[in-house]
């Protein structure tokens, strides 16, 4: 790299907040939607600066002949308020709203605590999401979209047909359990129940139009409930990276307490989460690691860290495998 390239590279990182805040504003004001009609009600020069800035990145296009005239591009079209067509936009919107909390990086570094949310008046990241009602929808839609992008790969790798009761802990909108029940009908499996377990406010807002009578939703809380719904298969998707080692062990211990009197060696836990592989660079995982650390004190783990953590529980690791997308791996646990 030449000095000028290094300079430009560092400058691009240093000014990244401009891009993020600009994206945040156009999403909040639904500018891509309004460009389809008319974009009135804003200061003309301020709007021009915003659109001009984003047009240099390919978001919006400035007319070559008419001054201050902009139109949508293929990129900005995806930001039009149609999350059924482009559901990943939920995550982009959620991410850019987190910008203010990153000003506490230095204090988090010094204290080892999630100061981003604490200094902003929240107990933790979940308290933040719960109280910021406008963000809650985007957060849970993001979790559902993560599931949708991975569930087909999961169903190809994992055979769920021999489990009687499958419990998805923190299952959000129930996408995983529904997909499993859709694949394994009563005539080709022994599945009697598929339970989606999540917070009261999540379950209450879920759609109630799924018809399979094996599907159940149960309200609860990882840390205030003494036990969880009883099953012989548990799914824990994108959950453990949001918590500290002690919190993960608390959840695993509650699973053990829930099943120890009902099942012996039949129980499996499938953890779907990130594994940090040092020889593979993943910008999305690194960014998400930074985010959950600032918001909630969570952590991404290397394979060695996963091994050491599980050894402290009543379970053992049977299998570790990567899904086709490097962003997700699965760890299969059974009772010791």
Curated annotation (Swiss-Prot):
One of its GO terms (molecular function) is O-methyltransferase activity. The keyword Thylakoid does not apply. The keyword S-adenosyl-L-methionine applies. InterPro entries: COMT-like, O_MeTrfase_dom, SAM-dependent_MTases_sf, WH-like_DNA-bd_sf, WH_DNA-bd_sf. It comes from the Eukaryota. Its EC number is 2.1.1.-. Pfam families: Methyltransf_2. One of its GO terms (biological process) is biosynthetic process. The active site is at residue 241. S-adenosyl-L-methionine binds at residues 170, 198, 221-222, 237. It is an enzyme of class 2 (transferase). Keywords: Methyltransferase, S-adenosyl-L-methionine, Transferase. It catalyses: (3,5-dichloro-2,4,6-trihydroxyphenyl)hexan-1-one + S-adenosyl-L-methionine = 1-(3,5-dichloro-2,6-dihydroxy-4-methoxyphenyl)hexan-1-one + S-adenosyl-L-homocysteine + H(+). Belongs to the class I-like SAM-binding methyltransferase superfamily. Cation-independent O-methyltransferase family. COMT subfamily. This is O-methyltransferase 2. It comes from Dictyostelium discoideum.
